[in-house]
Each structure stands twice: as C-alpha cells, then as structure tokens.
C-alpha cells in the first residue's frame, strides 16, 4: 500500500506537464461542429419584408405564379431557401390585404434561419407564416447541439416548433451517431426547450436499448416537464445501476424530480425531490424509498428490515420581515444507510443526521425562536446517549445607548429527553443579562462587559441510571452525583481591546500591511457543576478566534471558571486592489488560576497555570492559482498538540487542481470532546496526510485522485481514483474507491468497503461542457473542499 502514493503523485505530475500541450477546450471543440448564423439580423414584421429571388432562369405568369430554375436563392428577412428549382405561387384571398405567398422547391433543397437548418430533396414553405415542410430531409439546430432526420419535417409557429414524422434526434455532431432517439413523431419546442417524442426508441449506435410510448427530453437549460438525461453505471456493491429522472414543472413556484433508480443487486429505489417557493420561504423535500434491499444485513451481519428510506426537508425563509422559518431535517431508516447508498443529503463522514425545526420572530429590539432539536447518531451505541430538546425557546432583548452602555438580555427554556429511558431528563431555565461599554474609533476598540448567568435545572434521574452509566463507561467509572434540582448563578466580567495599525509596504508598491494586536481579560468564578448532567454540551476547538471566546464548552451545562488573559497578534497584507494576500495570527491564553467546572471532566484534572493554550492560523495566497493555509492548537491541560491542519492548493481552473493536506487531532482532545462515544477506530487520535487532484491528461480525458493515509493506524483511510472520457454527446467514467466504513471489534481492525464504478452520461443537451472532475471528487468519503 505504501508504494501507491508516490506512484499516484508521479502520474499526476506527468499529466500536469503533458496536458498543457494536449488539452483543448471541450466547449470550443463541440461548437466547431455546430452551425452559426453569421448574417446581420433583420428586424420587423416578416410579412411586410420583401421577398428577393435570384435564379439562372425565370418564367412568370404575373401575378399568380413564377418558376425559377438553376441556383435559385429565395430570401425574406432572416430566412433563406436554396434549390435547383422553385415555384412561387401568390394567391389573393378576398378581404385580405396581403396575398398568400408559397414556394415549392425541388432538387438539393436547403433552408436556414437563425434557429435551424434543413436539407432535403423537396420542400415547401409559406412565406407569410414561415410554415415549412421538407420531405426525407435532415436538420441541424443553429447555435446549439442537436440534429437528426425524418421522413417529413415541418416548421410551425414562426419556427418555434420542429415536427418530425418518423424522425430521429441526437446531440452528437455530424458523423457521430453514438446515441439517438427515434420516434414516430418528434416535436421540438425551441421556446420551451424541450423535445416530445412518441413511440420513442433509444439507440446506442444502431442497437435499440430502451422503449417508451412517450418521452420528453430537455434540449436547453429552461425548466420544462420531461425526462432528463438518463444515467447508467456499474458498481461492485450494487451491480448495474440505471437512473431515468423525470422533471415535473408543476407551477412557477413548484417542481419535482422523480427518479427510478434500478440497482441490480439491491432492487428498485424511488428517489423523489420536491421544491417549492412560498411566502414563508423556499425549501426542498426529498423521499428516497427502497422497499426491499436484497443485500442489507446490517453492520453485525444479522438480518435487518430490508425496507430502507431517507426523508429530508430543508426550508429557509422570512415572512413579513419579522417571521423566520427554518427546517433542517434528515432521517434515515438505519445507521448503515449512507454507507450502503449514495445520497446528496448526507454521507458516512457526518456521523449523525440533524433534525431541527424552528420558527422565530424578530422586532426592532427583541427576538424569540422556538425550536425542536434532535439528532440521529450513526455510531454504535451513540444514539442511546443522544438528547433531544423539545421544545427549546430562546429570547433576546437589546437596548442600546443607555447613556454610554448597551444592554442585552438572553433567556432560554428547554426540555431535554433521551431515547434511552435509563438516562436522566431535565428542564432547564436560563437567563443571562449583560451590560457593556463599547468604545471605538477608526483604529481601535475597547469593549467592557459584565453579565450574570443564572440557570435552574429540574432533573429527572431514573433509578437505573447508576448501573446504566457503569455499563456504558466501565464498571470502575465514577457515577455523577446528580441532584433533582440545581440552581447555578455565575457572574462574568470581560474587557476586550484591539488596535489596527497599517502602513504601505516598502518592497511592493500598492501593498498595505496591517498589525492588529488584541488583548482580552476574562473572569468567571468557579462553580462545581458535577451535579448537572451533560445534555447539549461539548468541548469547543481553541483555534485563534476561539482564544477570545467567553466559553470553553458549547451549550450551558458546563461553564468553566476563568481568570485569564488572552493575547493575540494578527498581521495582514493587502494588494493594490484590497485583496487579502497573506495573514498570520498567533495567540495564547495565560491562566492566573485553574480553569475547571468540577472534577468529572478530563480537562478539569490539570492544576497548571500560566500559558496553557496556544493557537495560530495562517493564510498565504501566493497568486490567483496557488495558496497555503494552516492552523495549530496546543493545550497543555490535555498534554499535547490537540489539533492541527495544513493545506496547500494549486488551482489553475475548474478542471486543474492539486491539493496536499494534513489533519491532526490528539486522542486526548477526542476523549475530552466526545467522552460518551467509545470507538477504537478513532480514540487513538487522527493523523492523516493526503492529496487530492484533478487534471486533464489529454484531449477530452480527465483524471482525478484522492489518497489519505492515517499515520496513527498505519493504514489508508481513503483511496479514490477516477478517469473520465468526454465527447460532445456522451461521457464515460471509470472509478475505484476504497474507504473505511466501520470497526471490526473481533480482530480490532478497520472495516473497508471497495467499490468499482462505471458510469455513462449523455451530454450535449445543455450548456454543460465540463470534464466532470467536480462530480468525481465530490463522490468520495472525504469530498474535496476548496482551500481558498
């Protein structure tokens, strides 16, 4: 395994050099085979425009008809008809001021306008309405991909509709018949950008592979009901997969996509997505339903319910400028769902699914939010310790300019329940008034704040709590000495000052450098909180910005004492267009006394004082393509470097990118952050080095790769390689992914999942001519994220 990393890196370096000479822009290549209309556009009523005819020979019976032979060219406005012979007929109907003029053309007939080109042996056209017929002809769209042939072609509705009888349609360029759709009748609506096909037969080459009595295909980017581009692929887990999305444009503010997703080894899954736009906001609802998964046996190998599903609802909106509605709800049938099945609404790396509903009201100086919060945890046993806040009410009141002071009052009421009946439950009431004195000018600020944190807990402690706690945390674990009723009152005082200095840089004209020192003093007296259970609290990261937070923990269950000074220094460099090119920040927390919440937390066991916590962040955008960033946090209370990351990325454009990164989390930090979750797979810490890259390797070929190696476990964490070949009307993708999906308790090793995928995509029906690298990189367990 260790030899694969340099081999992949060498390959990427070679392709980076080679592709500079071989890559041509795919969009430009595709448009080379598409006809364009390069004549000046004529405006005005087509019926009022004159008809110009040139021919080698003319015979006329004025005013009824005329016969033109030899190199005939008929022009009216933006329409041109050429043929060997053309007969012009003019009929004056009673009561109509404009006569009906028609032409019948024979012999090498060609018709073109700004939207379409037609070619055939015989044609007819009404010069008044632009209705045109062509026998046994061929057509090609102007300015976009799309062509075909038919026994009879018709143009109707001022060239809006192209109607084909026994016709074909393909987005492939002339000379390439890789795929096509054949129908007894095909209607192409240029305004709605859709093709309707009756008795549709989908062909690959000359071989029919799919039949439908009726089909709609989009031929543009406009919203329109109809079948979207089908997709087929092969994976080692699911076998052959085929997806045929149907888009339903229900109304201007409603639409839906229904996708039957056939998986050879699992069965038929229905993927349904509904989008809406209403006065309270916009949102998306999704339901994925696999009624009988033939492969699912669960993580322990036992039989599980084969019905697998996912429900998602995302909503965000504001109504009447004061009401706010938000929903972020995801629920799946089982904890293995994202491991086995691909979804845009979650992944195995998330670890949990969020289920939050909230409605808020905001006025000029106060706001209130009522929410329901719940989490579906996927780790083994993790869901037994998960808590839900149902309901949770948060309120804020602001009153500024009370003399030189600003007043803020925050309040919360929450009820916590657990899915495990042996866990404590609680009602929590919290009020937090604060008053601050803000002072600021153009180069600095000083903010002095005093607040009072008052919290009441009413806890319901079950009789079996002690034994349940020991079963989960070990028989030698110390059971928290919880109380039914707890009152906690803690004052807080803080002074925060910062200054910004700037100067022109001597060595680079137009560049500006800033120096931004910051000092904060924080005092919070100690209160023992071991009699309060943990409901929504976890240890937060101490990155540079975190050095100046009031709290060490999220939530309200733990408020750490503090008698400390945080100091930091930031320097930034801006170019002549005020784009930030470089910054570096370094800071520390100096503790005058021990910071603690009681005796139960790991981080409370340290008696050290002084400079205990250090953090630094840096960012360097060397140029528009190359950048570096990183950060590190050191906490002597946990005995080591706790968190670290570093990223270097070169991005030339959307298709060419190389990223190197490293991420680290100490086992002590993980234990302190998630003490109730026991998983040997990551309790030893995280130390991963990896690379992610995408690069065109030759004309129309793109390669992506990702490799992450865990230096703690001495094993690969994730491997991904994919290659895609793109043409103007189809693309083919071959990929391999190997990822960790769990932990085997029997032999104490990581469980891996290996997946080989083979994917075919139809192209040319929209304006997307990308090489597909973004989709391939986003499919991995550790999806690519841009560094800058």
From Swiss-Prot:
Q: Determine the domain of life of the protein's source.
A: Bacteria
Task: Give the GO cellular component terms, alphabetically.
Answer: cell outer membrane; transporter complex
Instruction: Offer one Pfam family short name for this entry.
Output: LptD
UniProt cross-references to Gene3D superfamilies, sorted A to Z: Lipopolysaccharide (LPS) transport protein A like domain
Among the record's GO biological process terms, what is one? Gram-negative-bacterium-type cell outer membrane assembly
Per its UniProt record, what InterPro entries does this chain match?
LipoPS_assembly_LptD, LptD, LptD_C, OstA-like_N
Q: What HAMAP family does this protein map onto?
A: LPS_assembly_LptD (MF_01411)
What is annotated about its quaternary structure and interactions? Component of the lipopolysaccharide transport and assembly complex. Interacts with LptE and LptA.
General function of this protein? Together with LptE, is involved in the assembly of lipopolysaccharide (LPS) at the surface of the outer membrane.
Name of this protein: LPS-assembly protein LptD
Query: Which organism does this record belong to?
Result: Yersinia enterocolitica serotype O:8 / biotype 1B (strain NCTC 13174 / 8081)
């Amino acid at each position: 395994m260790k030899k694969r990393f340099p081999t992949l890196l060498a390959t990427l370096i070679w392709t980076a050099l080679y592709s500079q000479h071989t890559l041509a822009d795919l969009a430009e290549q595709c448009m080379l085979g598409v006809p364009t209309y390069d004549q000046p556009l004529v405006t005005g009523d087509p019926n009022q425009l004159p008809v110009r005819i040139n021919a080698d020979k003319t015979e006329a019976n004025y005013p009824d008809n005329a016969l033109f032979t030899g190199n005939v060219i008929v022009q009216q406005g933006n329409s041109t008809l050429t043929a060997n012979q053309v007969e012009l007929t003019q009929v004056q109907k009673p009561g109509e001021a404009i006569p009906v003029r028609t032409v019948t053309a024979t012999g090498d007939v060609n018709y073109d306008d700004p939207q379409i080109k037609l070619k055939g042996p015989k044609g007819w056209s009404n010069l008044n309405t632009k209705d045109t017929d062509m026998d046994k002809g061929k057509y090609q769209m102007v300015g976009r991909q799309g062509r075909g042939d038919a026994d009879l072609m018709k143009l109707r509705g001022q060239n809006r509709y192209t109607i084909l009888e026994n016709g074909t349609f393909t987005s492939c360029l002339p000379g390439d018949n890789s795929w096509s759709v054949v129908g007894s009748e095909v209607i192409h609506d240029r305004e709605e950008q859709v093709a309707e096909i009756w008795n549709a037969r989908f062909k690959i080459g000359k071989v029919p592979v799919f039949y439908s009595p009726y089909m709609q295909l989009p031929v543009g980017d406009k919203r329109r009901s109809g079948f979207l581009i089908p997709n087929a692929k092969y994976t080692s887990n699911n076998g052959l997969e085929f997806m045929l999305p149907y888009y339903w444009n229900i109304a201007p503010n409603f639409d839906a996509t229904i996708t039957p997703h056939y998986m050879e080894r699992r069965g038929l899954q229905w993927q349904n997505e509904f989008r809406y736009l209403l006065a309270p906001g916009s949102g998306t609802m999704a339901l994925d339903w696999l009624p009988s998964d033939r492969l699912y046996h669960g993580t322990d190998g036992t039989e599980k319910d084969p019905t697998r599903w996912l429900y998602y609802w995302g909503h965000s909106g504001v109504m009447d400028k004061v009401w706010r509605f938000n929903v972020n709800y995801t629920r799946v049938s089982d904890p293995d769902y994202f491991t086995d099945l691909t979804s845009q609404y979650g992944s195995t790396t998330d670890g949990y699914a969020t289920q939050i509903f909230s409605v808020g009201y905001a006025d000029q100086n106060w706001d209130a939010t009522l929410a329901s919060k719940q989490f579906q945890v996927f780790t083994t046993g993790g869901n037994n310790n998960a808590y839900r806040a149902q309901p949770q009410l948060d309120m804020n009141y602001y009153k500024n300019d009370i003399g030189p002071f600003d007043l803020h009052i925050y309040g919360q009421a929450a009820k916590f329940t657990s899915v495990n009946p042996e866990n404590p439950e609680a009602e929590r009431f919290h009020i937090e008034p604060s008053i601050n004195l803000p002072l600021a000018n153009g180069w600095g600020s000083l903010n002095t704040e005093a607040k009072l944190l008052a919290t009441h807990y009413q806890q319901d402690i079950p009789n079996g709590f002690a034994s349940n706690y020991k079963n989960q945390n070990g028989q030698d674990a110390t059971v928290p000495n919880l109380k039914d009723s707890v009152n906690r009152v803690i004052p807080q005082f803080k002074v925060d000052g910062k200054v910004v200095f700037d100067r022109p840089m001597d060595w680079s004209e137009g560049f500006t450098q800033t120096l931004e020192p910051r000092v904060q003093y924080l005092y919070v007296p100690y209160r023992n909180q071991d009699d309060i259970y943990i409901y929504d609290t976890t240890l937060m990261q101490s990155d540079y910005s975190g050095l100046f937070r009031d709290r060490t923990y999220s939530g309200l269950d733990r408020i750490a004492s503090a008698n400390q000074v945080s100091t930091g220094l930031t320097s930034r460099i801006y170019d002549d267009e005020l784009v930030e090119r470089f910054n570096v920040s370094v800071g520390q927390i100096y503790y005058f006394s021990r910071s603690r919440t009681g005796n139960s937390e790991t981080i409370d066991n340290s008696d050290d004082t002084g400079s205990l916590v250090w953090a630094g962040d840096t960012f360097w955008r060397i140029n528009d393509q190359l950048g570096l960033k990183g950060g590190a946090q050191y906490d002597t209370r946990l005995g080591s470097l706790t968190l670290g990351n570093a990223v270097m990325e070169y991005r030339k454009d959307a298709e060419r990118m190389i990223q190197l990164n490293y991420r680290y989390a100490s086992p002590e930090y993980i234990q302190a952050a998630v003490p109730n979750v026991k998983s040997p797979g990551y309790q030893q810490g995280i130390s991963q080095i990896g690379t992610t890259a995408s690069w065109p390797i030759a004309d129309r070929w793109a390669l992506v790769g990702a490799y992450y190696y865990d230096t703690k476990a001495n094993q690969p964490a994730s491997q991904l390689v994919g290659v895609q070949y793109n043409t103007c009307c189809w693309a083919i993708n071959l990929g391999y992914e190997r990822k960790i999906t769990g932990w085997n308790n029997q032999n104490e090793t990581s469980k891996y999942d290996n997946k080989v995928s083979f994917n075919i995509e139809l192209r040319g029906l929209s304006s997307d001519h990308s090489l597909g690298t973004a989709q391939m990189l986003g499919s991995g367990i550790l999806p690519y994220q841009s560094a800058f």
